[in-house]
Amino acid sequence: MLKLVIGNKNYSSWSMRPWVLLTQAGIPFEEIQIWLGEPDTAAQIARHSPTGVVPVLIDTVNGAELRIWDSLAICEYVAEKFPGKALWPADVAARAQARAVSAEMHSGFSALRSNMPMNIRNRYPGKGMAEGVAADIARVATIWRECVERSGGPFLFGEFSVADAMFTPVVFRLHTYGVVLDGAAAAYAQRMLDAPALVRLAQLAQAEGHPQARYDSKYA
């Protein structure tokens, strides 16, 4: 069985992407959770991760252990390992676009990330709108609208895919900070929040405890 090493569900945006993909796709995995911000966190992560960060996916291939780090690389591996789950679009052009927006999410939107830290269980309406954040949000909304309109929905490329998993943290961030969207972008964000994997993640984030002052106190 696959093993997925993650951090706190409430705060670790990188961890939640492969967690949501596996959960939404119904792919069984063993979860290894390491609490962030604790005295032994670095040592615990080092037992599993060659880079010292989470997430890490652990698999056994031909009798040898395989470790994959980086959320997008993990999602790519899962999509290839389980082709029947159709985690990328079947159409070549749509698949290229899905990879493009996933990569853009992976490397971009720094203003939004910095000023709207991941925090599923708290609410900070109106906070975080620093320079550059509005432009990031506008770009996200454009991606969502164009992808859903092109594919016909309900998700970015029809059925739930790697691209949706990659945008999961932004969906939660916009909800936490009370960002109002409209039209197809708003409808997509709500469909994501209603997806079983995101509902379950939000429930677990609410219940897990282990608060992190560096996140919780930013807009307290």
Residue ranges and their predicted role:
Residues 105, 109-194:
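GST-like fold's C-terminal all-alpha helical module
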Residues 40-42, 193, 211-212:
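Short Asp/Glu-rich motifs
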Residues 35-37, 188, 206:
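Conserved beta-strand edge residues that scaffold enzyme active sites
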Residues 79, 170-171, 202:
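Active-site-flanking alpha-helical
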Residues 205-220:
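Acidic/histidine-enriched, glycine/proline-rich intrinsically disordered or flexible terminal extensions
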Residues 31, 183, 201-202:
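A generic structural-conservation signal
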Residues 1-129, 219:
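GST-like domain detector, emphasizing the conserved glutathione-binding G-site
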